[in-house]
Each structure stands twice: as C-alpha cells, then as structure tokens.
Amino acid sequence: MNNCIKVVPIALRCQQRTISTSSVLEGKRNFRKFNAYNKRGTRVVKEAQKTLANPPVAIHKRGVRDTGILVDGQYVEIPEKIPDIIVPDLTGCKLKPYVSYKAPDVVQSEFTSLDLFNAVYSQKIIEDFKAGKLQKDGSAKEPSVNEQLTPEEALQRARKTGSDIF
C-alpha cells in the first residue's frame, strides 16, 4: 500500500502542462544544431559512398570544391580548377589598411560614360583645339592610341583580363 501512495504523485507530475519560452532549436532532442555530415547511415551506405562513382547518398564535402574529375576510376587533377590567391604588390602604396570610424563618409556618384569620356579624351581634345591640330570635321590630325581604336577593338580591350571595367 505504501508503494501505491508513492507512485501516484509521480504520475500526477508527468501530466502537468508547461509552457516553454525558449526556442525549439534549444530542445534536448533537436539535432539540427549539430553538423553531423557523413555520420548517418549503415556500413553498406558508407561503403557505397566510397566505392561507387555516383552513390545514392552523396558525400558532403563541407563547401570544398573538387580540383579534378574521375576518369575510368582514376582521379585526374585539373590545374585550372586549383584556386590561386593573387596578392598584389603594395610597396609604395600610401593607403593604410585601417580606416578610423571617425573618418567622414565618402559619397561617390555613379560612373557614367561622360565621366569616362572626360577622364580619357577631354584633355587631349582641349590641347588639340588650343594648338589648332583639329581637322574641319573635328577629328584630330595626330590621333592618340585610344582615338585610333575601332569599337570592336575597344570592347575587346575592355573585356580583357586585367582591365578595370568590373
């Protein structure tokens, strides 16, 4: 009889309703907050991941890209897929790596075609006009290298690696 009396309060405590104010993600049985990549599955599934070229459950690589491909079961590394870190030479650079929070905000307008024209051609046109080196149609008698470019050549030069178009 004494045992029954002890069991009843325990049963009543289990039936109480509670309100949880914490997030569902903080729960005891929530495994979403743990990264368990490549840990789940049977031995058969893990062996299939290792041996098959296209396994039913892909191996999670945690964001690292392959630097090659599988050809006839052999891994062939492709040099173009290996990332290169290009570090510019900053000797003689007057810019400092740290910008103070007290520095004023710099607002720059959008770079337009007029700005590009003024940066590249305007000075040469003004000098040619003052020196009288313009023809009757307004073109230069002695054109510069940039003025001699055709539209196709200018587009090709702008798309070339190392240009500051992007």
Curated annotation (Swiss-Prot):
Q: Where is this region: Disordered?
A: 136-166
Lineage top rank: taxon: Eukaryota
- Transit peptide: first to last position: 1-26
Output the Gene Ontology cellular-component terms.
mitochondrial large ribosomal subunit; ribonucleoprotein complex
Question: InterPro entries per the record?
Answer: Ribosomal_mL41 (IPR019189)
Classify the main location. mitochondrion
Query: Which family would the database say this protein is a member of?
Result: Belongs to the mitochondrion-specific ribosomal protein mL41 family.
**What protein is this chain from?**
Large ribosomal subunit protein mL41
Species per Swiss-Prot/TrEMBL record: Drosophila melanogaster
From the UniProt record, report the name of the gene that encodes this protein.
Answer: mRpL41
